[in-house]
Amino acid sequence: MDEKWRLSKKDALAASCSSSSTSSKSKFSRSFSTSASSSKAPAFVRSSSTKCSVPSSSSSSISRSSSKKEKGSITQKYSSLAKEQKGRFYIMRRCVAMLVCWHKHDS
């Protein structure tokens, strides 16, 4: 069985729009094909739900109240990204400290 990994169009859009949901879920779809039969099995797609929407031509005129909502969501997005990076840095710092301690005790 041949396995072909590709990024589906829906997941490519979600990957460009989502912030922290990409760290725990895979964005690739897998399609299977067999050499014995001429027809291909349907592609199985595993995706995550995102809160990102596709911009449309009708949303080009933004009122001041909606721009404040977008500004708040952008602030919230970057705040959550900063918290995630801070958590990752803390874990890495603890791991390095543990490895240094093991190295000192080993010597």
Curated annotation (Swiss-Prot):
InterPro entries found in the cross-reference section: DVL, DVL_RTFL_polypeptides
Transmembrane segments: 9-29
Keyword tags: Cell membrane, Developmental protein, Membrane, Transmembrane, Transmembrane helix
GO annotation, cellular component aspect: plasma membrane
Cell location: Cell membrane
Disulfide linkage: none
Stretches for region Required for DVL/RTFL small polypeptide activity: 73-104
UniProt feature coiled coil, ranges: none
GO annotation, biological process: negative regulation of cell population proliferation; shoot system development
Membrane topology designation: Single-pass membrane protein
Pfam families according to UniProt: DVL
Location of region: Disordered: 1-79
Regions of compositional bias (Basic and acidic residues) in chain numbering: 1-12
Major subcellular location class: membrane
Function: Small polypeptide acting as a regulatory molecule which coordinates cellular responses required for differentiation, growth and development, probably by restricting polar cell proliferation in lateral organs and coordinating socket cell recruitment and differentiation at trichome sites.
The family this protein is said to belong to: Belongs to the DVL/RTFL small polypeptides family.
Name of the protein in its database record: Small polypeptide DEVIL 9
Protein encoded by which gene: DVL9
